[in-house]
Curated annotation (Swiss-Prot):
Compositional bias annotation for Basic residues: 249-258
Function noted in UniProt: May enhance the cell surface expression of odorant receptors.
Assembly: Interacts with odorant receptor proteins.
This protein's GO CC annotations: cytoplasmic microtubule; endoplasmic reticulum membrane; endoplasmic reticulum tubular network
Chain intervals with Basic and acidic residues compositional bias: 199-216
GO function term, MF aspect, one: microtubule binding
Protein name from the UniProt record: Receptor expression-enhancing protein 2
Keywords for the protein's UniProt record, in alphabetical order: Membrane, Transmembrane, Transmembrane helix
Membrane topology term: Multi-pass membrane protein
Localization (cell): Membrane
Length: 268
């Protein structure tokens, strides 16, 4: 693990950052020798990175693998060994010059095929997206219609409840409006002065009512037997009174006044 960390640090520092800065200096000074040197190095280092990805997966178990990789990077950069220029001139340049046409043909074919494949996949992706959008829209319309129906039913129930509440509120306001009127009417009736005649009439009526109440209370206090005796006596008295009245009328018959003719005859 420690060797892997050290190897990665060495590759990044000495294999990438330092050659990048040296290439910048070569471009700035326009030195052809340095420019060619670092161009050869970058070609070899690109091949090294591609081979490194494969060897890290296959040969990482090999002992001293990471130490050998550090030594190889230093060999490429050393101005004494000039490993990058040696590898490029002996192996890379001859192989690339021999396979250059084939490589160019592969590149052009890859471009054309990549364009065709990209267009094909793009069309398929658009078709899939369109079908997905249509299906989602249909499902969404169904869900929205169901929700709208449920909302419409809820709105109708809410409207009915609001109408009932408004009617109840109108009744309450009507009763609340009539109550102050009734109170004001009673206040005006109480405030209006009562005439003296009406007061005397009311007082006489109240006296009569009090007398009648006292009489009723006396009658209730009396026993049933005295009531029967009083009733029989009262029944006999009117009959006697009627006979006395008839006799008096007979006795008190009016006397006839003497006429003028009788007066003349009686006169001598």
């Amino acid at each position: 693990m420690v060797s892997w960390i050290i190897s990665r640090m060495v590759v990044l520092a000495f294999g990438t950052l330092y050659p990048a800065y040296s290439s910048y200096k070569a471009v700035k000074t326009k030195n052809v020798k340095e420019y060619v040197k670092w161009m050869m190095y970058w070609i070899v280092f690109a091949l090294f990175t591609t081979a490194e990805t494969i060897t890290d997966m296959l040969l990482s178990w090999f002992p001293f693998y990471f130490e050998l990789k550090i030594a190889f990077v230093i060999w490429l950069l050393s101005p004494y060994t000039k490993g990058s220029s040696v590898l490029y001139r002996k192996f890379v340049h001859p192989t690339l010059s021999n396979k250059e046409r084939e490589i160019d043909e592969y590149i052009t074919q890859a471009k054309d095929r990549s364009y065709d494949t990209m267009m094909r996949f793009g069309r398929r992706g658009l078709n899939i997206a369109a079908t997905a959008a249509v299906t989602a829209a249909t499902k969404g319309q169904g869900v929205l219609s169901e929700k709208l129906r449920s909302f419409s039913m809820q709105d109708l129930t809410l409207i009915q409840n609001e109408d009932e509440l408004q009617l109840e509120g109108g009744d309450d306001t009507h009763t609340a409006a009539t109550l102050p009127r009734a109170k004001t009417a009673t206040r005006t009736v109480r405030a209006t002065p009562v005439p003296a005649d009406t007061e005397s009439q009311h007082s006489s009526r109240s006296d009569d009512q009090s007398d009648s109440r006292t009489e009723h209370s006396d009658e209730d206090a009396a026993d049933k037997a005295p009531k029967r005796i009083a009733i029989t006596r009262a029944a006999k008295k009117p009959a006697a009174a009627k006979t006395e009245q008839t006799t008096k009328t007979v006795k008190k018959a009016p006397k006839k006044k003497p006429t003028t003719a009788n007066n003349v005859a009686e006169s001598p």
